[in-house]
């Protein structure tokens, strides 16, 4: 008998953490700690920027939306993963898997476009500082944020439709800890070559288009920095971009490795490690690398806590 389509009545089952009970408990404690730090750090960044009028600038506007996007991304994946590590149900319904893939892909794509918008903001700040206020006006900033979110959701929807348009075979065990495109695609019946190509093209478009704008922005930024006569001035100008560059390199490096490879090169252990970095570690780097080293953010956080404590008193 041939393989049968069972997606209408059977759930998917995650096998990403089919290890010993002691190791699962250790992983649960580790990922719960990382998740709580990630969640609270990003929420604090959003609150600090919202409460401090000195941070109502385009750069911090984009940063707050990036923190919001990262928070939503982790909310769609990590709580479900922690439940599995704690001994909860490892099954997820067909609709639940599709929803998880849609939201995780949408937020991941949105992050790419927000990072591109942040790169453009740095370009205007360094290359045209006298016209920064007029160029980066509220209307343009709102358009960049809305476009990032809408485009991210369109690409996320496209990837989800490509995957769940396929028929799935009797094997319904996902060798992963969430419904990501490569492991779910590996469960499909028949020739998945065309679908694999479509996913590759969609991923390539997201990464290339956003990374192209970042590269162009930094090419102009580098040229402007090299024209600064003093080494101190060059160092100060570059320091405003260093955190953004760090996040870009890690974000795009992990995403390219996961999504821009053919199905034949999929490796369970290696891809789970990269996915862990992309899902758990990268969202934590945003507040640490990009924000918590920023004196303005630190001051805003202190003022917010001080105001709250005084209000209680």
Curated annotation (Swiss-Prot):
It comes from Homo sapiens (Human). Disulfide bonds join 97-189. One of its GO terms (molecular function) is G protein-coupled receptor activity. The gene is OR10Z1. Keywords: Cell membrane, Disulfide bond, G-protein coupled receptor, Glycoprotein, Membrane, Olfaction, Receptor, Sensory transduction, Transducer, Transmembrane, Transmembrane helix. GO terms for biological process: detection of chemical stimulus involved in sensory perception of smell. Residues 47-54, 121-139, 218-237, 293-313 are cytoplasmic. It is a multi-pass membrane protein. PANTHER family: OLFACTORY RECEPTOR. The lineage of its organism: Eukaryota, Metazoa, Chordata, Craniata, Vertebrata. Pfam families: 7tm_4. Belongs to the G-protein coupled receptor 1 family. GO terms for cellular component: membrane; plasma membrane. This is Olfactory receptor 10Z1. CDD domains: 7tmA_OR10A-like (cd15225).
């Amino acid at each position: 008998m041939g393989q049968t389509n069972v997606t209408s009545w059977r759930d998917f089952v995650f096998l990403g953490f089919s290890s010993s009970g002691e190791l699962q408990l250790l992983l649960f404690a580790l990922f719960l700690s990382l998740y709580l730090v990630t969640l609270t750090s990003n929420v604090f960044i959003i609150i600090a920027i919202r409460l401090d009028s000195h941070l109502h600038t385009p750069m911090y506007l984009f940063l707050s939306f990036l923190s919001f996007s990262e928070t939503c991304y982790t909310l769609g994946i990590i709580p479900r993963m922690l439940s599995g590590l704690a001994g909860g149900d490892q099954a997820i319904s067909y609709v639940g898997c599709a929803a998880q893939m849609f939201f995780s892909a949408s937020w991941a794509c949105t992050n790419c476009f927000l990072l591109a918008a942040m790169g453009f903001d740095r370009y205007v700040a360094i290359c045209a500082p006298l016209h920064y206020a007029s160029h980066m006006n509220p209307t343009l900033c709102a358009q960049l944020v809305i476009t990032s979110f809408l485009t991210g959701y369109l690409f996320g929807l496209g990837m989800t439709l490509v995957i769940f348009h396929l028929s799935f075979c009797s094997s319904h065990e996902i060798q992963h800890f969430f419904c990501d495109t490569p492991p779910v695609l590996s469960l499909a019946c028949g020739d998945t070559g065309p679908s694999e190509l479509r996913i590759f093209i969609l991923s390539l478009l997201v990464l290339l288009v956003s990374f192209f704008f970042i590269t162009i922005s930094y090419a102009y930024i580098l040229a402007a920095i090299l024209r600064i006569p003093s080494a101190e001035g060059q160092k100060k100008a570059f320091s405003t971009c260093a955190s953004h560059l760090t996040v870009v390199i890690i974000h795009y490096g992990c995403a390219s490795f996961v999504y821009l490879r053919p199905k034949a090169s999929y490796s369970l252990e290696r891809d789970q490690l990269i996915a862990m970095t992309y899902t758990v570690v990268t969202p934590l780097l945003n507040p640490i690398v990009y924000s918590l080293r920023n004196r303005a953010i630190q001051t805003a956080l202190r003022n917010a806590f001080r105001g709250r404590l005084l209000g209680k008193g």
